[in-house]
Amino acid sequence: MTKWTLGYSYPIALTISLIPALTPAIVQAAPLTPPPATGILDGLCYDYVPKVEKLAPGKDANAQPVEVDADRLEAKQGGTAVYQGDVKVRQGVRKFDSDYAELDQKSRDVIAIGNIYYNDGQITVTSDKTLKSNLDTKNSELEEGKYQVHGSPVRGSADRVTMTNNNQNITLEGAQYTTCPPGQEVWTLKAGSIDIDQTEVFGEAWNASLWLYDYPVFYFPYINFPIKDERKTGLLYPGYTQSSKNGMDITQPFYWNIAPNYDATITSRFMDRRGLMEQVEFRYMPDPAHVGSLYFENLADDKQYDETPSLNEKLSDGHRYLLNARHTSLFADNAMRVSVDYTKVRDRDYNYFNDFSPKVGTQVENQLQQSLMAGYFQQNWNLNTEVRTYQILLASAQQPHELMPRINHNYYHQGNWYDLAWNTEVTRFGYNNTQASAQNLGDAYTGTRVYTAPTLTMPLIDEAGYYLDSQYKLMYTRYDQEVPDNMSSTFTKRFTPEGASGVTLDEGIITRTLPSFRLKGGMTFERNQDWFGGDANQTLEPEFQYLYVPYKDQDNIGVYDSTTMRQDYYSLFSDRRYAGLDRISDSNRVSLGVTTRVYDQAGDERIRLAVAQAFDFVAPRVKLYPSESLATNTRSPLSFEGDAKINEQWFAHAGAQYDMDQSEISSANSALEYRREKLISQLNYRFVRNANYDLSNTNQVADLNQVGMLLTTPLNDQWHLYGGYYHDLDQGVKVDRKVGLKYDSCCWSINFNLEWVNTPDNVTMRPTSERSLGIQFEMKGLGSVGTGSKGTSLDTEALPYIRPFNLRDQ
């Protein structure tokens, strides 16, 4: 309660402090975000909301001078002061008006009547009735009050507002609460009584009902809601979806606020075609440098087990579960970092992610990653180590080698006329023979690899507009390799050259020393030109690279973490043909490329076109596997990349690699996108030769040849349509289809989305079709009910939305 000392030395107490009482919403597991930020119409919806007013930092509101104005002041016998007629009191940002105010100096009671208006910069309260307050007890009571929170759409009314215990305890009787604009009250929460303890996180309401327009739709004998940006134990709103695979899918989360830096969410997920799954997530942050979470979900008995061959042929019963652990720690002023990312499902439960779509885990090419990393980082050197294992989610896939562990050291030094880099790595490669045996795939070779490579880079020319660099590298590798007798047939085939009768792998110590010489240079030419009636700047940037690495036979070395690099413009100017260290390709190659860019007057890049090709003086002889044929091509595919910002709405991208020896395109991608305010539409295409499974014969490969269409567009101020469509042209399969419709008004929204997705069964590799319906209903400022995306995302279950436009500042 604030005591105002007036110029007449008659104090008046006007104690309105309702802000925490007027921000009810659903129980939430994460801090609230200050409104208004509730929809696509914020600028139109909330222009009536008053701004928050505060005194300058360091100023005490109670120490500000008080100004009082009234038509009449009367001091009555007995110590009563009466203010009548247009009473106005001002103190800093505080404002109080009424028709009549009376102060009893003996009882310290204050009464204000008629046209009561109170504004403290954070809330406005009005009433045509009576305000009663006592300066000693600091208790106040207001009849038939209306309130509006500043900086927020929260508003409402109460038949009676009672404030006690120095305004810490507030009771609203006959209360109403909404975030809808005046005259558009689609929903209102009405309660017989609302109690607020401002020292607590949540308020409580009894005999509450939710009204849509003039009709009650839900009744709550009791409900609590947050009044602060903090968390509290309680039920979260349930979620609902309907899918062809799981049937009716209902989730009911319970949030447990264990401590300010520890919490847990316990969710019961009922799927009528599968059973009851329990999900538990525990989050912890003992201090900001140490953060992590543990997540577990368990389905004791999947009702689909007996009816699904890919389950009952691989699992002994219908028990299915997932475990995920994530942790990050920082030490020594963030110079030392430790992280854990571990995800596991039951062994041989290959379709777990297809069936339940958990939102945790790092999954790459149907492999669950399980890693522990630690590193120490300084300005010119770093030392890091990693232990990494995998769980395969594809029944027919070969196990990758595991890092048990990898230790990596990097050193950098920049001199006046040279740069020195030194990379050293020691890796022990293991193999999960147990999991491979469960797949009937046999064992694999293992080994320890030591690699070190000092690199000296010397700029020969470094002038404005052109450069020429030389690079010298010496690469030493040492393997200590073990080759099992019962090696997997997959590896046996890969390491048996055509026409030979045995594998080329050697057991024991193998060393490899290779030098590398690289010469790379480029030039930049510029000219001014006209760009659709405006000035523009065009560049022409030719570049070249010569790379020499001598040949050394490496067929006796296993392939542990290496693969062929993706072919594109940038890979042609790399010093590697293979990613990883197990294969260092011989090279006697010249790469030539040219890029042109167009910049407008504002400096924005509008066009980028690049074309490049590499030419080998001698075709490379190093192969990834000995069973492969020797390369005969002495030139790489012709690579093209192009991007254009046609105007502020239209963007285009195209890329292709053309194999001139085979006279065919090896890969291509393109996209055309239109953007205007909230409208986004995109047509895209991608092609990669021999990069897909043949769905009619899973032992064969097929071309990846897919077209996609995406759209999100407002139909009017409230309705929004969005969707996506992906189709495989080669195999005639609709990969993913999604359509959604969202209604978004100032105080509520509803979102429907329907999706059909074809995903391969990870055991049979046959496509399985899944249909799902998501519904999301939101009463802004109160909470949401349902599942699925609240927004109008262009992501689909199978593929994410990507803007493939490689322009600067775009």
From Swiss-Prot:
This protein's UniProt keywords: Cell outer membrane, Membrane, Signal
Domain of life of the organism encoding this protein: Bacteria
Leader sequence segment: 1-29
Record note on quaternary structure: Component of the lipopolysaccharide transport and assembly complex. Interacts with LptE and LptA.
Cellular component terms (Gene Ontology): cell outer membrane; transporter complex
Protein name, entry field: LPS-assembly protein LptD
Localisation: Cell outer membrane
Role played: Together with LptE, is involved in the assembly of lipopolysaccharide (LPS) at the surface of the outer membrane.
One of the GO biological process terms: lipopolysaccharide transport
Transmembrane parts of this sequence: none
Family label: Belongs to the LptD family.
Keyword Membrane: yes
Organism from which the protein derives: Aeromonas salmonicida (strain A449)
Gene3D superfamilies: Lipopolysaccharide (LPS) transport protein A like domain (2.60.450.10)
Keyword Phosphoprotein: no
